[in-house]
């Protein structure tokens, strides 16, 4: 799941939408990996999204950036199927924009410097297999590319 990630730079509690930028340090690409089999069997997402190598971020943090209308794409370069565009969306189409997300989350938890908030993913998520490569691109930030490896090969 390719997503825009917001990196928090200042402590924030009950941050109103009008002041959301005051707590943001910058933005980066996120690959929100899920183990769908565990997600289905557990009935919730903590373990399915909590493995050590899940949710890579990068390639860097962009501090001078307007997240309101940028493209977010995810490509899967699979051993069996070649390079395929899996997700293509714009942040302008998100159900909840960064100001609303920050206002909501900070209403029940204090945001701390270094916290990362994922903003949601376009349609098109799908399975990945060992040997594949996943590339998440956010227009104006760059591209994050990660290999898919099995748990046995991840050390």
Outline where the language-model segments fall.
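Short, basic and Ser/Thr-rich N-terminal targeting/leader segments
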Residues: 1-2, 23, 55, 68
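Short, structured patches in soluble enzyme cores that scaffold and shape functional sites
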Residues: 2-4, 8-10, 28-33, 61, ...
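Catalytic-pocket segment enriched in acidic/His residues
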Residues: 36-155
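N-terminal accessory regions of nucleic-acid-interacting proteins
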Residues: 13-27
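Residues on a specific face of well-ordered alpha-helices
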Residues: 22, 28-31, 36, 55
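Short beta-strand segments in beta-sandwich/barrel cores
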Residues: 11-13, 142
């Amino acid at each position: 799941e390719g997503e825009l990630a917001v990196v928090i730079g200042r402590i924030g509690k009950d941050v109103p939408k009008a002041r959301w930028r005051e707590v943001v340090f910058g933005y980066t690409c996120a690959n929100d990996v899920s183990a769908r089999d565990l997600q289905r069997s557990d009935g919730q997402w903590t373990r399915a999204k909590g493995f050590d190598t899940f949710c890579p971020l990068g390639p860097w943090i962009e501090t001078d950036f307007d997240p309101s209308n940028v493209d977010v794409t995810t490509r899967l370069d699979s051993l069996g199927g070649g390079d395929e565009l899996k997700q293509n969306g714009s942040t302008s189409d998100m159900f909840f924009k960064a100001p609303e997300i920050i206002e909501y989350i900070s209403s029940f938890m204090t945001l701390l410097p270094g916290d990362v908030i994922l903003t949601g993913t376009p349609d098109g998520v799908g399975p990945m297999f060992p040997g594949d490569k996943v590339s998440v691109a956010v227009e104006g930030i760059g591209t994050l590319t990660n290999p898919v490896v099995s748990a046995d090969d991840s050390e």
